[in-house]
């Protein structure tokens, strides 16, 4: 879901999602999206999932396994989606201002686009959420 959030911002900004810098360019893999997702994985997804487990929102019986892997059951998927959307709407301190996580992602993608447009790496500031 975070992947799709970033992909939509990359496309809206007219960036080429398959040309990245950290992830290997491979046919069918949007390397730029993978690059941009790295900053958000821990502060957004990892922290959310850990909080869900700590609050017993996700329990062992909500997981189903089969020969292809381990998956959330329908009840758990609904809880996860609701929590994810709530997290994206929640505020965070993004540099000097308060934004929702969704707006912060958009801002960070814009900063990356500015670097490309102006060929100036100093326009990109690494993510610092407080």
Kindly label every feature range from the protein language model:
Residues 1-130:
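N-terminal intrinsically disordered, cationic/polar leader segments
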């Amino acid at each position: 879901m975070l992947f799709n959030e970033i992909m939509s911002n990359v496309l809206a900004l007219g960036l080429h999602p398959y040309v990245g810098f950290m992830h290997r360019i491979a046919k069918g893999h949007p390397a730029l999206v993978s690059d941009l997702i790295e900053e958000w994985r821990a502060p957004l997804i990892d922290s959310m999932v850990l909080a869900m487990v700590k609050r017993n929102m996700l329990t062992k019986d909500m997981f189903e396994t089969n020969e292809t892997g381990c998956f959330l059951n329908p009840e758990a998927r609904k809880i996860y989606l609701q929590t994810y959307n709530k997290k994206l709407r929640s505020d965070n301190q993004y540099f000097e201002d308060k934004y929702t996580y969704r707006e912060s992602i958009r801002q960070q993608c814009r900063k990356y686009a500015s670097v490309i447009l102006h060929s100036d790496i100093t326009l990109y500031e690494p993510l610092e959420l407080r």
